[in-house]
Amino acid sequence: MHQYQDLLERILSDGAEKTDRTGTGTLSVFGHQMRFNLSAGFPMLTTKRLPLKAIVHELLWFLKGDTNIKYLRDNGVTIWDEWADANGDLGPVYGHQWRSWPAPDGRSIDQIANVVDMIKRNPDSRRLIVSAWNPAEVDKMALPPCHCLFQFYVANGKLSCQLYQRSADVFLGVPFNIASYALLTMMVAQVTGLKPGDFVHSFGDTHLYSNHLEQAKLQLTRAPRALPVMRINPDVKDIFSFRFEDFELVGYDPHPHIKAEVAV
């Protein structure tokens, strides 16, 4: 995954020093794009180990429309703990907006169900979009969505996805986001009878926190290894019916984990 290594190098060489909400400080660039051909392997970072369990369960949690961390905690995933309130609630974050976007007339809009249906009925549509950025509810969210809008595209029997990420924690968050949306693209492709195409990752404020710089430099000393293969249970034909057991990552041989503190 040279694309990710190239991004680390760009930020370290060209990044501007900026302050941020957490008070940590960042090196930041504005505007970047990476493209991953999903037929060339599953884009799971190999220059450090990533936890597949957390990535898959978080995505399934989003697709459930859930915004309480109980499901995550029950499955040993703690990545949202810092932002939850005493009851485990996060407010109307990703899952709520994906599955229950509130309409002015009181209805709830299931954006995921709608986009899957539209891909099947009108694959050439330019409206195959899901948005998590709801200005009316941002202030109620424990953390406003960083990966805030994605669009699907169908051509030659293949499904591609482009994600726009307004704010990108490149060392900790972005590797998760790449794997998560690549997997989502593969899942949607399967349930719509298509092959996976490309995952395109577009960024706004693209940054390394100041307490991640040495870790990023260490990661750049490591050569990327061959990408693994993601196997998905072919019997699942409904986007909301996937379970953790339906996914198998084959041939994942990463370099060791690199510890870094999350900026809250």
UniProtKB/Swiss-Prot annotation:
Position of the signal peptide: none
Alphabetically ordered keywords of this record: Cytoplasm, Methyltransferase, Nucleotide biosynthesis, Transferase
GO cellular component: cytosol
Cell compartments where the protein resides: Cytoplasm
Main location: cytoplasm
Top-rank EC class of the record's enzyme: transferase
GO molecular function per UniProt: thymidylate synthase activity
Binding-site residues for dUMP, renumbered to this chain: 21, 126-127, 166-169, 177, 207-209
Active site: 146
Record field: catalytic activity: dUMP + (6R)-5,10-methylene-5,6,7,8-tetrahydrofolate = 7,8-dihydrofolate + dTMP
Pathway: Pyrimidine metabolism; dTTP biosynthesis
Pfam family, one: Thymidylat_synt
Classification via CDD domains: TS_Pyrimidine_HMase
Binding site for (6R)-5,10-methylene-5,6,7,8-tetrahydrofolate: 169, 263
One record GO biological process: dTTP biosynthetic process
Known EC number: 2.1.1.45
Family label: Belongs to the thymidylate synthase family. Bacterial-type ThyA subfamily.
Annotated function: Catalyzes the reductive methylation of 2'-deoxyuridine-5'-monophosphate (dUMP) to 2'-deoxythymidine-5'-monophosphate (dTMP) while utilizing 5,10-methylenetetrahydrofolate (mTHF) as the methyl donor and reductant in the reaction, yielding dihydrofolate (DHF) as a by-product. This enzymatic reaction provides an intracellular de novo source of dTMP, an essential precursor for DNA biosynthesis.
Subunit structure: Homodimer.
Name of the protein this chain belongs to: Thymidylate synthase
